[in-house]
UniProtKB/Swiss-Prot annotation:
Gene giving rise to this polypeptide: purA
UniProt organism field: Brucella suis (strain ATCC 23445 / NCTC 10510)
Keyword Membrane: no
Requisite cofactors: Mg(2+)
Record protein name field: Adenylosuccinate synthetase
EC numbers for this chain: 6.3.4.4
Active site as annotated: D13, H41
Keywords recorded for this protein, A-Z: Cytoplasm, GTP-binding, Ligase, Magnesium, Metal-binding, Nucleotide-binding, Purine biosynthesis
Free-text remark on how the cofactor is bound: Binds 1 Mg(2+) ion per subunit.
Gene Ontology, cellular component aspect: cytoplasm
Binding-site list for substrate: V298, V299, T300, G301, R302, K303, R304
Amino acids binding IMP: D13, E14, G15, K16, N38, A39, G40, H41, T129, R143, Q223, T238, R302
Subcellular locations according to the entry: Cytoplasm
Pathway in which the depicted protein is active: Purine metabolism; AMP biosynthesis via de novo pathway; AMP from IMP: step 1/2
Reactions catalysed according to its record: IMP + L-aspartate + GTP = N(6)-(1,2-dicarboxyethyl)-AMP + GDP + phosphate + 2 H(+)
């Protein structure tokens, strides 16, 4: 019985929510291991939509859900999201939700700094959600973060806040912002402490005990591997590691506990925010994909950029995340196109390459090299077996497998969880 890591294989928004929900019904424990409340997803269960951005998807199914130490937690958003779920009839208690005691907190100063940087008229715009994710990770690495466990120790909380503000107030002075008083941050923290502390735990211990007891653990990744701080399109990336290896570091469970890595892969490509996008389509096909695929961000509402499937970046992610198989999503969006293109390589300064360069300049200069396949006029929407798929659709899927070097384990043909074709069970050893 394998544990499963779910990772986005592109730039996020691949449809992880539906796949995670499908898998979470069979899992015993669901773990968030990186990111914050900057990447959202929607679950549709019995006609009811649940929009989550911080809490693990397993909560809506009553499964033990864990926020690992690799996540940055906005305590006020945490409380709001818990209350929203309760308002939809979901029972959220410490019996089903645990938060790592060593998870860093996002504070108001992080959100303000994030917004100020992104709104600046000078410098490089990354396209953040302005929710304080990046600045919170900066403080974690700088060893000045306030962590969840600090809320239990008033005697050490004040000096930690003082140290934090010594850094932030120097930044604020340089940006022409008013300095923040220690009491302001202390009040911000103490006002919410009683609502988050009942959920804290030694998550590494809880997960290890569950693993030894034979529980099936599902690691729920946020965003996509091409937004990874090391392996993504730097600097147009997020502030955490999003590749599958982070599941171990961000949960406290050793890497040998990771069994199967499932890469969620959209049948075309999208990206939100700034950064290179070799196969982007600024034409009627791009508009078609965006409109039919409802390509708008769950958290920000921002319109996503759309383009053809890029086998180069997915093949690279298969390697950097150790992907065993992919879940191919939104196949139905391609229905009706006369022809479909797949990027199989890039041209860089007159040379053919089979990888995405690390250099920002080179990433901007690469040109896609396409193969063109015939499309299909039949519908794939709602298909639940290979026999339901048009012959040309099957050829498209098989060609993707060949190009990326990984098999398709699951196929999604609509937002409904039942419209899923299972090829390989990720939980099966």
């Amino acid at each position: 019985m394998a544990n499963v890591v779910v990772v986005g294989s592109q730039w996020g928004d691949e449809g992880k929510g539906k796949i995670v929900d499908w898998l979470s019904e069979r899992a015993d424990v669901i773990v968030r291991y990186q990111g914050g409340h900057n990447a959202g997803h929607t679950l549709v269960i019995d006609g009811v939509s649940y929009k989550l951005s911080l809490l693990p998807s397993g909560l809506v199914r009553g499964k033990l859900s864990v926020i690992g130490n690799g996540v940055v937690v906005d305590p006020h958003h945490f409380v709001a999201e818990v209350e929203k779920l309760r308002g939809q009839g979901i029972d959220v208690t410490p019996d089903v939700l645990r938060v790592a005691e060593n998870a860093p907190l996002i504070l108001s100063i992080h959100r303000e700094l994030d917004a100020m940087r992104e709104g600046s008229n000078s410098g490089l715009k990354i396209g953040t959600t302005k929710r304080g994710i990046g600045p919170a990770y900066e403080d974690k690495v700088g060893r000045r973060a306030i962590r969840v466990i600090d809320l239990t120790e008033p005697e050490t909380l004040r000096p930690k806040v003082e140290r934090l503000l010594a850094h932030h107030n120097s930044l604020r002075r340089g940006m022409g912002l008013e300095e923040i008083a220690v009491e302001t941050i202390l009040t911000e923290l103490t006002s919410v402490a009683d609502q988050i502390l009942p959920y804290i735990d030694q998550v590494w211990r809880v997960l290890d005990e569950r693993r030894k007891a034979g529980a099936r653990i599902l690691f729920e990744g946020a965003q996509g591997a091409l937004l990874d701080n090391d392996h993504g399109t730097y600097p147009f990336v997020t502030s955490s590691n999003t590749v599958a290896g982070q599941a171990a570091a961000g949960s406290g469970l050793g890497p040998t506990a990771i069994g199967y890595v499932l890469g969620i892969t959209k049948a075309y490509t999208t990206r939100v925010g700034e950064g290179p996008f070799p196969t982007e389509l600024n034409d009627e096909i791009g508009e078609f994909l965006g409109t039919k695929g409802h390509e708008f961000g769950v958290v920000t509402g921002r319109k996503r950029r759309c383009g053809w499937f890029d086998a180069v970046i997915v093949r690279q992610t298969v390697r950097t995340s150790g992907i065993n198989g992919i879940a191919l999503t939104k196949l139905d969006v391609l229905d009706g196109l006369e022809e479909i293109k797949i990027c199989v390589a890039y041209e860089l300064d007159g040379k053919r390459i089979d990888y995405l360069p690390s250099s920002m300049g080179a990433q901007a200069r690469v040109k896609p090299i396409y193969e063109t396949l015939p499309g299909w006029s039949e519908t794939t929407a709602g298909a639940r077996s290979w026999n339901d798929l048009p012959a040309q659709t099957v050829k498209y899927v098989r060609h993707i497998e060949e190009l990326i070097g990984a098999p398709v384990a699951m196929l999604s043909t609509s937002p409904e969880r039942e419209d899923t074709i299972l090829v390989t069970d990720p939980f099966h050893d």
